[in-house]
From Swiss-Prot:
It is found in: Cytoplasm; Nucleus. GO terms for biological process: methylation; oxylipin biosynthetic process. This is Probable jasmonic acid carboxyl methyltransferase 2. Its EC number is 2.1.1.141. Binds 1 Mg(2+) ion per subunit. Pathway: Lipid metabolism; oxylipin biosynthesis. The record marks H150, M222 as: Involved in substrate discrimination. It is an enzyme of class 2 (transferase). It comes from Theobroma cacao (Cacao). One of its GO terms (molecular function) is metal ion binding. Catalyzes the methylation of jasmonate into methyljasmonate, a plant volatile that acts as an important cellular regulator mediating diverse developmental processes and defense responses. Pfam families: Methyltransf_7.
Length: 373
């Protein structure tokens, strides 16, 4: 699987689009807001800036993209005025892979600029927004051009499927699964862990060259509390998706060999794995590292014991996951819209049944870093 070509959130603003099904990601941004605010406040207090470089990495599309930028600008503006300083110009860079729906973002900019002027008094001559296409697992910006880097719900995606998972032996390494599970052999766990180490180190090293000394970075992504990568909090949503896919295999709608050869380019690390890679690179000080529980549906459904509640929460989770992974499934399995609809209908039922018994939650890790001088 060529991750850079096939990984993108569902485009547009239709019923299965990311724009309409990103409540969980919005909740994650909201939970991390105090940490973002603290970091932005420190930058504004410690630097008299005429121009401020801000990058949102893995920006995707939809309402979350510009809302987080608006909030960061609010924070800078509030602190600057409190200190009696002029508000700096904003150089905003929105980054994602080449296949991201940048057009959706660009079409939203006129209304965004209008709101900036009406609500905040910030004219177009004070805010410059650009799209930057490419992988953040490598350099994206000139040296020392950024003051603040934000990334949310992106760094759990790997740059590639871990090498070696496509076994040449007769028996597949991770048979019947699409990600790490309780039945996965140690070699699968090791391959995923090593890929994360390589990717995250590359990310940190690249940003260390692009941020000014004293620059800040707040990263938020899926993780886990346990050192065991097979716990429910880190991989059970993939396990349930595999169950839905295998039900289609049993009916002859999907080839089993296709399932055995699919491995999600995803990894939910524990805090210790993150610390090790940051210390290895040596360019940043860890200011904060915290974990938060997030409901699979973003907390929208409170009563899952009733038949209606079970149905509703299953559908909400299925829509959220579909908006994120459909492009990969479509590319790998080559299935049409009818089978895709059937798959996520089954997934919704499986998820609803699971959450009516156990309210498994995501663990979202938020880390605030300071670039060393």
């Amino acid at each position: 699987m060529e991750v850079m070509q096939v990984l993108h959130m569902n485009k547009g603003n239709g019923e299965t689009s990311y724009a309409k099904n990103s409540t969980v990601q919005s909740k994650i941004i909201s939970v991390g807001k105090p940490i973002i605010e603290e970091a932005v406040h420190e930058i504004s207090c410690n630097n008299l800036l005429e121009s401020m470089g801000i990058a949102d990495l893995g920006c995707s599309s939809g309402p979350n993209t510009l809302s987080v930028i608006s909030e960061i600008m609010d924070m800078v503006q509030t602190t600057s005025r409190r200190l009696g300083r002029p508000v700096p110009e904003f150089r905003v860079y929105l980054n994602d892979l080449y296949s991201n729906d940048f057009n959706y973002i660009f079409m939203s900019l006129p209304a965004f600029y209008h709101r900036l002027k009406e609500e905040k008094g910030i004219g177009c001559g004070s805010c410059y927004i650009s799209g930057v296409a490419g992988s953040f697992y490598g350099r994206l910006f000139p040296s020392k051009s950024l003051h603040f880097v934000h990334s949310s719900s992106s760094l759990h995606w790997l740059s590639q499927v871990p090498p070696g998972l496509e076994s040449k032996a007769l028996a597949p390494l991770n048979k019947g699964k699409v990600y790490i599970s309780k039945s996965s052999p140690q070699s699968v766990l090791n391959a995923y862990s090593l890929q994360f180490q390589n990717d995250f180190s590359m990310f940190i090293e690249s940003r260390s060259q692009e941020l000014v000394p004293g620059g800040r970075m707040v990263l938020s992504f899926m993780g886990r509390r346990s050192t065991d990568p097979t716990t429910e909090e880190s991989c059970h949503h993939w396990e349930l998706l595999a169950q839905a896919i295998m039900s289609l295999v049993r009916e002859g709608l999907i080839e089993e060999a296709k399932v055995d050869s699919f491995n999600a380019p995803y990894y939910a690390p524990c805090a210790e794995e993150i610390k090790v890679e940051i210390q290895k690179v040596g360019s940043f000080v860890i200011d904060r590292l915290e974990g938060f529980e997030i409901d699979w549906d973003g907390g929208a459904v409170s009563d899952v014991q009733t038949a209606q509640g079970k149905l509703l929460i299953g559908q909400r989770v299925a829509k959220t996951i579909r908006a994120v992974v459909e492009s990969m499934l479509e590319s790998h399995f080559g299935i049409g819209q009818d089978i895709m609809d059937d798959l996520f209908s089954r997934y919704a039922e499986i998820v609803g049944n699971h959450l009516s018994k156990t309210r498994t939650k995501y663990i979202n890790l938020v880390i605030s870093l300071i670039k060393k001088g």
